[in-house]
Amino acid sequence: MSDSWYKVDNVAKVFLATATPQDPRVFRISCTLNEEIDPDTLNEALRSTAQEWPQFQVTLHRGLFWHYFESTDQLPTAQPENKAPCAPLYTPERRNRLIYRVTYFGSRINLEMFHAITDGNGGLLYLKSIVRNYLALRHPGELDSVPSPNSASAGDLAQDSFAPSTVEQSAIPWQKRSRSTASTVCACPITSSSSLRAT
């Protein structure tokens, strides 16, 4: 067990607050190959990918006042698909488990993630890494020229991309206005970000 823990960003808090058994806030991305999935090779590729993306190797915990992510030494294991798509990933009985799952069926690899950990773009990049590592193991030498989808630094991958857009109350340049002045002050800059965490 690692000592590292991470704050849950504001967008993740929304998903935590609104997740229900009927709407568990889980999304699924899949990739269908031209060949049957080999489970042993997929698990080897998944372990390799998990080491490349340590920010997804976390469990979600409830603190006294807030939730937080804690790094874990657990390794993901790909399982045959045997549940309904997007089954809950964060429930009281799953508290100390990873909050994503990888399954396979026939020639398809499925990635399901709890939305508090990343958005669809982050999930897609993670699945691309799994598939690339899987195909590199299945067909040695054929993917040497294909770059890894994970080209960002560990710091870039772990950052809260909404933080630059957040303005503290004391930083807003409020001006005293009369009631007759009908105008709105907006001090939040609009920024773009290439990090994984978004909505």
Give the location of each predicted region:
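N-terminal low-complexity, Ser/Thr- and acidic-residue-enriched intrinsically disordered segments
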Residues: M1-F15, A19-Q22, F27-T32
